[in-house]
């Protein structure tokens, strides 16, 4: 009998670092399943999860403060290897009898750590060798506190000029602490260190692969729904597209996809979705023309949150109407992914602050008596894309820039009108087309056009024109938490601007948004 892909597993306890999800993604890239839980997990929950190793993440708190987060005592009594990263190392040291002090010299950014003695975690892993023969690692630091005294039975395994205990270990208990962040790419050997911990020290097997994830998902879908029919709201985005392919592979024609054309999509997007999933892949797909209904429900609304809620409410009503026509559908499929699950858990505990309401429609109508199928709820976005490729979806679709759930509803500023959407669709298509032509599209993280509800004077030939303004927006980011505006070539911007103004009657001016995040958000609304 083949092994379950979840049999080898690592537990990551989150102490609030901005890099914690990155740790989980790196561990999974190695081929090992892991889950991310809040630091205040109970002993019973850890026992039930039964991990082969535990990682303690970094965090913004200070272990020198009385009420700062601590790892559950059971973590150090569970008999499995433990890796503490940054704050995780500090709380390990403090809880096991060492001491942590605030440092006069804080370390943020690139640093070199020199290996000291022998350590299973670092063995034969280094970037440089000192004249004295010691290995050196290029790493990324981000800490204000430091371990002053390591616990008894621990030894120092790395140091810097300002941090005498940059890493420590208890080889007998297989406890390891590193003051730097192996999960970020700036730590050049970081992935090797995480692999050393997960595979060699914890004894995990590489069971978490795209092909095995697909097989497991299909098996679970079949077990869950049996011979029942399933309905899916297909948007053409990455998540719902991969869900559609997975469920179709599992149950074939018993899946009905509902594609709602709300009039807020990109140019020709509705036809592209129908061609790909209906004609090419042979899915059972129902297209609902709902532009008029959405625009009517949005009339008079200019506040972004009001627009979002109206779009979400109308979608639920339209979708519910279709679902009632499919009397045999007993299951609703959704494209929930792992970060959504983490975000929901954080919100439930009051640890998250809502900046914008979530784009995805949350919850079902009270009278929709259906079970829920969420085949992607264990997966990060990069994993969803990888299995999408394995399922045969085209690269350009899977790696297309993010498009918000409300679509052009949050890219037309103020009140939504069909005229504005039509102008914006064409302007945005020109911008994206030129990015592809210049081979810039996949070098930036997100690019789009925004319709501004203001008019500007222009001149065409000898005639004066007084028409609308659009703004181009293009950013580069790793995690979308922060972003810098893309420094696109002036010549390129000139080509885009000229094409938009010359080819689209109704637009007289094009501007370029040079706001970073923070202080601005990536989307305007």
UniProtKB/Swiss-Prot annotation:
Where is the catalytic site? 86, 181, 183
Annotated InterPro entries: Class_I_gatase-like, GATASE, GMP_synth_C, GMP_synth_GATase, GMP_synthase, GMPS_ATP_PPase_dom, NAD/GMP_synthase, Rossmann-like_a/b/a_fold
Describe the reaction catalysed, as an equation.
Answer: XMP + L-glutamine + ATP + H2O = GMP + L-glutamate + AMP + diphosphate + 2 H(+)
Per the record, the pathway is: Purine metabolism; GMP biosynthesis; GMP from XMP (L-Gln route): step 1/1
Q: Which SUPFAM superfamilies match?
A: Adenine nucleotide alpha hydrolases-like (SSF52402), Class I glutamine amidotransferase-like (SSF52317), GMP synthetase C-terminal dimerisation domain (SSF54810)
Would the keyword Ligase turn up in this protein's UniProt record?
A: yes
| Domain GMPS ATP-PPase per the UniProt entry, residue ranges | 208-400
Q: What class of enzyme is it?
A: ligase
Q: Which GO terms describe its molecular function?
A: ATP binding; GMP synthase activity
Q: Where is the Glutamine amidotransferase type-1 domain?
A: 9-207
CDD domains recorded? GATase1_GMP_Synthase, GMP_synthase_C
Q: Which Pfam families match?
A: GATase (PF00117), GMP_synt_C (PF00958), NAD_synthase (PF02540)
Q: Which NCBIfam families match?
A: guaA_Cterm (TIGR00884), guaA_Nterm (TIGR00888), PRK00074.1 (NF000848)
Q: How does it assemble?
A: Homodimer.
Which protein are we looking at?
GMP synthase [glutamine-hydrolyzing]
Gene (name only): guaA
């Amino acid at each position: 009998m083949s092994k379950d892909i979840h049999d080898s597993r690592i537990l990551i306890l989150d102490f609030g670092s901005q890099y914690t999800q990155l740790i989980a993604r790196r561990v999974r890239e190695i081929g090992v399943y892991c889950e991310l839980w809040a630091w205040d997990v109970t002993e019973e929950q850890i026992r039930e999860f039964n991990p082969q190793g535990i990682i303690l993440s970094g965090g913004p708190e200070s272990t020198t403060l009385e009420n700062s987060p601590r790892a559950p005592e059971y973590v150090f009594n569970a008999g499995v290897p433990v890796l503490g990263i940054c704050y995780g190392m500090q709380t390990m040291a403090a809880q096991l009898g060492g001491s942590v002090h605030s440092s006069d010299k804080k370390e943020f950014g690139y640093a070199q750590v020199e290996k000291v003695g022998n350590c299973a975690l670092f063995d034969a892993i280094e970037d440089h060798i000192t004249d004295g023969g010691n290995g050196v690692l290029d790493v990324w630091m981000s800490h204000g506190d430091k371990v002053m005294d390591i616990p008894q039975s621990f030894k120092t395994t790395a140091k810097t000029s300002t941090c005498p205990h940059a890493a420590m270990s208890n080889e007998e208990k297989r406890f390891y602490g590193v003051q730097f962040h192996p999960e970020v790419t700036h730590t050049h050997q970081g992935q090797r260190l995480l692999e050393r911990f997960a595979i060699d020290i914890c004894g995990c097997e590489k069971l978490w692969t795209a092909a095995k994830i697909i097989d497991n998902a299909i098996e679970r879908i079949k077990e869950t729904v049996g011979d029942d029919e399933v309905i899916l709201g297909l948007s053409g985005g990455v998540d719902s597209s991969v869900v559609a392919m997975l469920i179709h592979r599992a149950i074939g024609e018993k899946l009905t996809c509902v594609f709602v054309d709300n009039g807020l999509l990109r140019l020709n997007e509705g036809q592209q979705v129908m061609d790909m999933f209906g004609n090419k892949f042979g899915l059972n797909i129902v297209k609902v023309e709902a532009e008029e209904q959405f625009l009517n429900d949005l009339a008079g609304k200019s506040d972004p949150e009001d627009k979002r809620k109206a779009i979400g409410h109308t979608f639920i009503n339209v979708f519910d109407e279709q679902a009632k026509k499919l009397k045999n559908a007993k299951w609703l499929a959704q494209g929930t992914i792992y970060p959504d699950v983490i975000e929901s858990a954080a919100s439930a505990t009051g640890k998250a602050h809502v900046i914008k309401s979530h784009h995805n429609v949350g919850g079902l109508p009270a009278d929709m008596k259906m079970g829920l199928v969420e085949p992607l709820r264990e997966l990060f976005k990069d994993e969803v894309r990888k299995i999408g490729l394995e399922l045969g979806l085209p690269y350009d679709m899977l790696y297309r820039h993010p498009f918000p759930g409300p679509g052009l509803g949050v890219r037309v500023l103020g009140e939504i009108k069909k005229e504005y959407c039509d102008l914006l669709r064409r302007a945005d298509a020109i911008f994206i087309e030129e990015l592809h032509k210049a081979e810039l599209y996949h070098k930036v993280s997100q690019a789009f056009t925004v319709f501004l509800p203001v008019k500007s004077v222009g001149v065409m030939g000898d005639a004066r024109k007084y028409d609308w303004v659009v703004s181009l927006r293009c950013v580069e980011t790793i995690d979308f938490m922060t972003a810098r505006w893309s420094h696109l070539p002036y010549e390129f911007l000139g080509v885009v601007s000229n094409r938009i103004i010359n080819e689209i009657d109704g637009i007289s001016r094009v501007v370029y948004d040079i706001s970073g995040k923070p202080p601005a958000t990536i989307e305007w609304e």
